């Protein structure tokens, strides 16, 4: 899985940072998933190497404008391109009526299947939001001024490495039989033998896991959702010195994000959703927020627009 940050500012864009959007590229299935879609996100697509035509799912954290104002335009542009097989959207209860209102009142027609899924029940009852043979998505409620949700994306474990030498030594012919054995299936051979694929594969290889967490003040629910994740993307709107304001506005400080990462035991923390106040001229800079977080959780980096990297399971990464 590859993560690309398309917007890392909170509230309003700045010269260096657009508002919230994170893309998740799934190369093996030629799909792109999007987490939040602030104003101008489709412009950010044009400045990146991402292909909007691959967009398959959008996960919305909450309905504040800096997280959703870019969604109608992006969906409309995707429709004009004429090469979408459909998009599924996941988010708070008002998401569907918001989109319907904007698209209807702007006389915009979406020429592809568009389905909206409410996540409130799944979040409150610890149910699965999305699942297929490769990936599982869960979510949890956050603590914010409006209903907000964090999302966890997990790749399911894959079969262990196939012992080709053993298969050859036992005279098992190559071809479709090998593919079935690699999947851990039981296979009947032409000579009457029955072989079990599990005897030819090593231990299952765990998949990568990513958690997207914004907007919220420090939340035990977020800690639980992020437990053991390889990557935690967490908002850090304010510096530690402005913790009182963070509580008032129901946002996180850099140290709250780091505390979440430390308690959850994640592999890496990325700080995003920075207040535009930390611009040139302010004695407090984004690097100060980074240092505050690293004092609590050392493997922390600072997001910037178009930062992109691969996410791999810690046990498999070099």
UniProtKB/Swiss-Prot annotation:
Disulfide bonds: none
Cofactor binding, per record: Binds 2 Zn(2+) ions.
Keyword Acetylation among record annotations: no
Residues that coordinate or bind Zn(2+) 1: 62, 64, 144, 215
Cofactor needs: Zn(2+)
Keywords recorded for this protein, A-Z: Endonuclease, Hydrolase, Metal-binding, Nuclease, tRNA processing, Zinc
InterPro entries given in the database record: Metallo-B-lactamas, RibonucZ/Hydroxyglut_hydro, RNase_Z/BN
Residues binding Zn(2+) 2: 66-67, 215, 273
Catalytic activity: Endonucleolytic cleavage of RNA, removing extra 3' nucleotides from tRNA precursor, generating 3' termini of tRNAs. A 3'-hydroxy group is left at the tRNA terminus and a 5'-phosphoryl group is left at the trailer molecule
Function recorded in the entry: Zinc phosphodiesterase, which displays some tRNA 3'-processing endonuclease activity. Probably involved in tRNA maturation, by removing a 3'-trailer from precursor tRNA.
Quaternary structure and interacting proteins, as annotated: Homodimer.
Protein name: Ribonuclease Z
Species assigned in the record: Prochlorococcus marinus (strain MIT 9303)
């Amino acid at each position: 899985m590859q993560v690309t940050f398309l917007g890392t500012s909170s509230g309003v864009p700045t010269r260096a940072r657009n508002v919230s959007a994170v893309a998740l590229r799934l190369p093996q299935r030629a799909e792109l998933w999007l987490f939040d879609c602030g104003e101008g996100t489709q412009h950010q697509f044009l400045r990146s190497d991402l292909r909007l035509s691959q967009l398959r799912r959008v996960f919305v954290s909450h309905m504040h404008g800096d997280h959703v104002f870019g969604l109608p335009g992006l969906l409309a542009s995707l429709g004009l391109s004429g090469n979408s097989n459909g998009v599924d959207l996941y988010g708070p209860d008002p998401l569907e009526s918001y989109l319907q209102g904007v698209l209807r009142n702007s006389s915009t027609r979406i020429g592809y299947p568009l389905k909206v899924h409410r996540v409130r029940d799944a979040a409150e009852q610890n149910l699965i939001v999305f699942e297929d043979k490769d990936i599982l998505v869960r979510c949890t409620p956050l603590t914010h001024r409006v209903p907000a949700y964090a999302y966890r994306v997990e790749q399911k474990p894959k079969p262990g490495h196939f012992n080709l030498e053993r298969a050859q030594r036992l005279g098992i012919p190559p071809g479709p039989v090998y593919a079935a054995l690699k999947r851990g299936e039981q296979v009947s051979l032409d000579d009457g033998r029955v072989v079990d694929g599990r005897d030819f594969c090593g231990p299952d290889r765990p998949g990568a896991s990513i958690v997207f967490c914004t907007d919220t003040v420090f939340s035990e629910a977020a800690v639980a959702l992020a437990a053991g994740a390889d990557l935690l993307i967490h908002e850090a709107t304010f510096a530690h010195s402005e913790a009182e304001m963070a509580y008032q506005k129901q946002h996180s400080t850099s140290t709250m994000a780091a505390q979440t990462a430390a308690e959850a035991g994640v592999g890496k923390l990325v700080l995003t959703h920075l207040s535009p106040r930390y611009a040139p001229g302010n004695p407090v800079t984004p690097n100060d927020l980074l240092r505050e977080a690293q004092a609590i959780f050392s493997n922390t980096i600072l997001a910037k627009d178009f930062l992109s990297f691969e996410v791999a399971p810690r046990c498999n990464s070099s």
